[in-house]
Structure formats: C-alpha cells, structure tokens
UniProtKB/Swiss-Prot annotation:
Disulfide bonds: none annotated. The gene is aspS. GO terms for cellular component: cytoplasm. InterPro entries: Aa-tRNA-synt_II (IPR004364), aa-tRNA-synth_II (IPR006195), aa-tRNA-synth_II/BPL/LPL (IPR045864), Asp-tRNA-ligase_1 (IPR004524), Asp-tRNA-ligase_1_N (IPR047089), Asp/Asn-tRNA-synth_IIb (IPR002312), AspRS_core (IPR047090), GAD-like_sf (IPR004115). Gene3D superfamilies: Bira Bifunctional Protein, Domain 2, GAD-like domain, Nucleic acid-binding proteins. This is Aspartate--tRNA(Asp/Asn) ligase. ATP binds at R223, D224, E225, Q232, E499, G551, V552, D553, R554. Keywords: Aminoacyl-tRNA synthetase, ATP-binding, Cytoplasm, Ligase, Nucleotide-binding, Protein biosynthesis. It catalyses: tRNA(Asx) + L-aspartate + ATP = L-aspartyl-tRNA(Asx) + AMP + diphosphate. The keyword Protein biosynthesis applies. L-aspartate binds at E177, R223, H461, R506. Homodimer. The record marks H30 as: Important for tRNA non-discrimination.
Length: 611
C-alpha cells in the first residue's frame, strides 16, 4: 500500500514517485492550493494538492478532516526556499499529490485534538477513555517506542552476558508475604483459588536450584494495593536472578546493564561506579531510603543540641525517644515568607500531609544573628545557637526548618518538605527537561521491622532475603537480642529520588529459611504448607544465588521525562484500578459464578442507603 514512511522522505528522494499512507494531521487551504500534513509512525510530511495538476485529488482534499486515513500517490519535490521547515525532518521536501484515496473517514467530532499543533491540556480521564486515539499523539507514540527500545537494550545486554529468558507461571498460589493478591477461582478444582503473581520471586529461585544459573524475564506482575501516580495494579518488571555471584558482583553487573540501557536509549555515558550509601545513612541524612541526591538540603540531627532547652516542643520530643532534625534552605529567607511556613501555608501543608504537627523555623541574618519565634529565641543560648549554625553550615540568608517528634514522622515530613522545596526553588529541572541522572545504591537494609500493632517482627523486603552473617548466627535461639539491628544482604538502586529496582542475596539453606519464616510469625506447619516446595528444593543442593528486579514502567517514565507511569503504558488503569476504555472490571453472568462455585456478597452502597 505504501512505498515509504511519511517521516523518511529527504532531499535524496526528490523526483521519486511515492505512495504514502497515514492520517491527516492538518489541512490548510491557501487560496487555490491545499496543503496536508500527513502523519504516520515515522513522522510527518507536507502534501501539496494543486488543482491544475490533479483535479480529482483536489476535489477529495477540499473535504478532508483531521484524522482521516489516506493513501496518497505523488512525486517528491524540493520545497520553495520560503517554505522550508527546519523543525521537521522532512522540512526540505514535499509531495505533489496526483491521487488521494480515503481509506477511512472520521464519523462525528473527535473527543480531543491529536495534532502536535493543536495539543492542549486534555483531561487524563478523557485521554484514557479514548486511549486508541490518545496513542496517535506524538508524545505517546514516542513513549511506547522508547519503552520498546529500553526492553530491547536490556535483552541484548543480558543475552550477551549468558542469561536466558524463561517464562514463569501467571497462575500460581496465594502466599502470605507481600501485598494483597489478585485471586482467581478454579472451575475444575472447586473451592480452590489461583493467585496472580506479585513477582516471580519463588519461581526464579527454583530456576537457580534447577541449574539455569542466569535467568531473566520481562515479567507481568499484579498487586491489589492502593494506587498512586507511579503504581499500577498490573505492572512490568525486568526480573533477573543469578547463581554463584556475591553482592558486589551482582551490583557491578547491574550497573553495566543500566549503563548499557542509557547509552542505547539516551546516548549517554553514565559515570561509574554508582555511589553507595547504607540504609541507616540514607534515613539519617535524607529521611528516606530513596534519596534524591541532585541537590543538598540534607537533614541534620540536632537532638543533642536542643534536648535540654526550655522550648518543650524540642526537648519533649527528645525526652520521649524521638528526634529534632532540620534542613537548611539556602536563600530561604528571601524565597519563603512566614505565611508559607505557618499553618495554612503551602510548606506547612506539605509537612502536615506527612503526619507532622507543623514546622519550627530560624532565619539566619547577617552577622550570624537569628530571627525566630520568641519561644525558641528566648530559650536558645548563644552556645546552642553557634552550634546549630556550625552543624548546619547555615550562612546569612539561610532558612532553617525544624521537625520534632517521633523519628519516623520527622524523617517523613522533612523528606517531603525537602522534595517540595527543591521543585519550588528550581533546584531540579522539570521532568521533561531533566538531564541529571543521580544513581545511588542503597545497601544494608534492616532484615526486619517491628509491627507494633501486631507485636511481631516482619520482613522489611521479603522473608527470602539472606541475612548478614555478622548479625544473625546459625542458632536462632540467640537471635532475640540482635533482631532490631540485623541487616539483610539487600540493595536498592535509586535514581533521582525514585526506586528503580531492588533485590537481595537469597537464603539457600532450608534450616535458615525456616528460622526466618518463624521469626516473622509463620509457624512451622504453616510454613511447610505454604512454602514446602521451596524447602524441599533448598534441600537438594541449592546454589548461592541472588538477583533483583527493575520496574520497567518507572524506568521508562524517567527516561521519557514523564510524571506518571500511565503515560508509558499502552492501556493503563486509573488510580481506582479501572480501565475507562473497556470499563473493566465489570460484572459477570450468574452462570459463570455458578460454574466457578462462587457467590457474590457485594452490596451496592447506594442501594443499601436507599433502603
């Protein structure tokens, strides 16, 4: 049907007869001559329709609408000097049309414009409802091509390193670790259920036991959890596992993988090695285990300086086992008014959203003088003031913002405020303009975290991470005193404040695996019922192994400079886990439920209220 792509035509094609297919991007009538911008996946080219040289083609062109599908026959010629378009790859040529065939027309009005010339801030809900049309937009088309490039580059690298792609089951069984499962009833095995995998975690470990040694998969994963901009109920992981490699070797190989992807997709040579930071240092300095290191404003712990001062908000927080931390905002005196920091202000609101009661502040003036509320100023000695300024490195013009309370809340609040101010004050570029790629390995994660509501320990990542041998010995009866500080051989790769991927060395000894499962509250009988197949596998000569998984959707979001992963997925769900285009999820016939031995107990709240 076509001889060339619209965006492929160049000066070397002048005088060639061509056939093109595509959509009408724009149509312009310039008093007797009609110009059509014809668009396909390769780009856009100008079509000139002259009634003196093609009367039938002109008659068709007079009535064309945007997004009409055309086949055009014509000859490539040079554009007149006055109409050259340097913004287009095809801007030096045009096609003089001799024939136009309408392959399909547009019925009714388009829900939103597609042409790059007419792009507007269309509501996302409307875009998702008509996703097939939204995908024609250059931005979306480019994102999907970039996604394909990213996966292709990863496959090429891994296969060159001796990895093989193996598919693992999508229908599996529900296990108690991780987030909530999506479950599916079995028709054949009445009363029993499959679960969709949250990750291929156990299967890839079994592949290592099976001697595969180097595995990867572009895996579909499913989690029934509350959603946000960078999460979806179904998502894609680049899943990797390998045997006979220690943590250092795994980190090195995956740095090489990331560098290979960035080179292939962005043409960038990333500096190596990537910096590393322990989980403890990340939490202390940034308040988060995924710090954005493109800018400063690190958290400074000043608990020891203010623990005895008369300002009870500070001293009380330390007395109750919490912390007082602050961030130093350079130029903050001029950039941030008191109104923005106090209740009702935008900066105050950011802290409040993270659970903080508010923010205290100190403005550093010329000569090291400070300006703050009386309750702080009156209770801060000269020695404490000088120590604060020294520890924070605050120069005149700096604004110090303080959080006080339990350490977790202080960290969360100041982390949120820090990220907010970095954007507000121009310390980082907008996503689409970003040219900083600050990678960071976060290592030495805690093995466990304590769940105070259930009065038990839980695995911070998952219960298959190998513990650091220095922290947990082989005798589980001696673990009680070391659990709070026990580290896992786990690692995350962070990019510009977002987790790009994470993994660990795995437990490959069945006795240790049972001990860890018991520690996180899974009795031996239940552990055997849920994970007996894994224990059996570990008992037949399981090799030392480890790996990690990268979030493909998030990786592509960062490479594309998008704010949401929904703009890097062909057919995403909303934050309510709905597909607006197909209206999924939807109801099913009673007969289907009967065949599955399932009865619905759902009651529509609107109907219940009306009764």
């Amino acid at each position: 049907m076509r001889s060339n792509g619209c965006g492929d035509l160049r000066k070397e094609h002048i005088d060639n007869s061509v056939q093109l297919c595509g959509w009408v991007d724009r149509r312009r009538d310039h008093g007797g001559v009609i110009f059509i911008d014809l668009r396909d996946r390769t780009g856009t080219v100008q079509i000139t329709v002259d009634p003196d040289l093609g009367a039938e083609a002109f008659a068709v062109a007079e009535h064309l609408r945007s997004e009409t599908v055309l086949q055009i026959s014509g000859k490539v010629r040079a554009r007149p000097a006055e109409s050259l378009n340097e913004k287009l790859a095809t801007g030096a040529v045009e096609v003089l049309a001799s024939g136009i065939t309408v392959l399909n027309s547009v019925k009714g009005n388009l829900p939103f414009p597609v042409s790059v010339h007419d792009e507007e801030n269309t509501r996302e809900e409307l875009r998702l409802r008509h996703r097939y049309l939204d995908l024609r937009r250059k931005r979306m088309n480019d994102n999907l091509r970039l996604r394909a490039q990213t996966i292709q580059a990863a496959r090429r690298f891994l296969e060159d390193e001796g990895f093989i792609e193996v598919e693992t089951p999508v229908l599996t069984r529900s296990t108690p670790e991780g987030a909530r499962d999506y479950v599916l009833p079995s028709r054949v095995c009445g009363g029993e259920w499959f679960a969709l995998p949250q990750s291929p975690q156990l299967f890839k470990q079994l592949l290592m036991v099976g001697g595969i040694e180097r595995y990867y998969q572009v895996a579909r994963c499913f989690r029934d959890e509350d959603l946000r901009a960078d999460r979806q109920p179904e998502f894609t992981q680049l899943d990797i596992e390998m045997s006979f490699m220690d943590q250092e070797e795994i980190l090195q190989l995956n740095e090489s993988l990331i560098c290979s992807i960035w080179k292939a997709v962005k043409g960038i040579d990333l500096p190596r090695p990537f910096p590393r930071m322990t989980w403890h240092d990340a939490m202390e300095r940034y308040g988060t285990d995924r710090p954005d290191t493109r800018y400063g404003m690190e958290l400074t712990n000043v608990s020891d300086i203010v623990k005895d001062m008369g300002f009870k908000v500070f001293s009380g927080a330390v007395k109750n086992g919490g912390a007082v931390k602050c961030i130093a905002v350079p130029g903050g005196n001029e950039a941030l008014s008191n109104v923005r920091i106090k209740p009702g202000g935008d900066v105050f609101s950011e802290a409040q959203k993270a659970g903080a009661g508010g923010l205290a502040f100190i403005r550093v003036r010329d000569g090291g003088e400070i300006d703050t509320i009386g309750a702080i100023k009156d209770n801060l000695s000269d020695e404490q003031k000088q120590e604060l300024l020294s520890r924070t490195g605050a120069e005149p013009g700096t604004l110090l913002l303080f959080g006080a309370g339990d350490t977790a809340t202080v960290n969360k609040a100041l982390d949120r405020v820090r990220q907010y101010l970095a954007k507000e004050l121009g310390m980082v570029k907008a996503d689409r303009d970003n040219d900083q790629w600050n990678f960071l390995w976060v290592v030495d994660f805690p093995m466990f975290e304590f769940n105070s509501d259930e009065n038990r320990y839980e695995a911070l990542h998952h219960p298959f991470c190998a513990p650091n041998a220095e922290d947990l010995g082989s005798d589980a009866s001696q673990w009680a005193d070391t659990l709070p500080g026990a580290r896992a051989q786990a690692y995350d790769l962070v990019l510009n404040g977002l987790e790009l991927g994470g993994g660990s060395l795995r437990i490959h000894d069945s006795a240790l695996q049972r001990q860890v499962l018991q520690t996180v509250g899974l009795p031996l009988e239940e552990a055997q019922e849920q994970f007996g197949f894994l224990m059996d596998a570990l008992d037949v000569g399981a090799p030392p192994h480890g790996g990690l998984a990268f979030g493909v959707d998030r990786m592509v979001m960062l490479l594309a400079g998008e704010e949401s992963i929904r703009d890097t997925i062909a057919f995403p769900k909303t934050q309510q886990a709905r597909c607006l285009m197909t209206n999924a999820p939807g109801g099913v016939a009673d007969k289907q439920l009967e065949e599955l031995h399932v009865a619905s107990t759902w009651v529509d709240p609107t109907e219940e209220d009306s009764n």
